């Protein structure tokens, strides 16, 4: 996983974005370790489910249940809460 901190203008509507094994983090993220832990879950999801299949399933889930009830986001939020201390200093 490669983490790159980007300026706010490049990511004005969120704190993090994962594209396979690349994680973009907004420099203004309030809790960067949480955001990195959250996005690390998405890296794992991309890896386990597949490069083409994961984005398809993620978008399908997003349309069906919205962002807050998306199973992939729920899993990432839980992992972020439980493991954020492991990502301090990144």
Give, region by region, the residue ranges found by the protein language model.
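Short alpha-helix carrying the canonical HExxH Zn2+-binding catalytic motif
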Residues: 29-44
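Charged phosphate-binding loop/patch that engages nucleotide di/tri-phosphates or the phosphate backbone
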Residues: 1-2, 79-90
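Juxtamembrane/interface helices at transmembrane-helix boundaries
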Residues: 1-9
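Membrane-proximal topogenic or attachment-prone low-complexity segments at protein termini
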Residues: 2, 22-26
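Post-HEXXH active-site segment of zinc metalloproteases
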Residues: 8-22, 46-78, 89-90
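Generic short alpha-helical segment signal, independent of protein family or function
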Residues: 41, 45-48, 81-84
């Amino acid at each position: 996983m490669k983490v790159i901190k980007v300026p706010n203008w490049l990511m004005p509507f969120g704190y993090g974005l994962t594209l396979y094994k690349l994680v973009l983090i907004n420099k203004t993220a309030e809790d960067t370790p949480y955001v990195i832990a959250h996005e690390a879950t998405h890296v794992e999801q991309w890896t386990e489910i597949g490069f083409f299949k994961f984005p398809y399933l993620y978008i399908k889930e997003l349309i069906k249940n919205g962002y807050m009830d998306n199973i992939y986001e729920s899993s990432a939020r839980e992992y972020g809460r439980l493991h954020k201390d492991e990502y301090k200093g990144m």
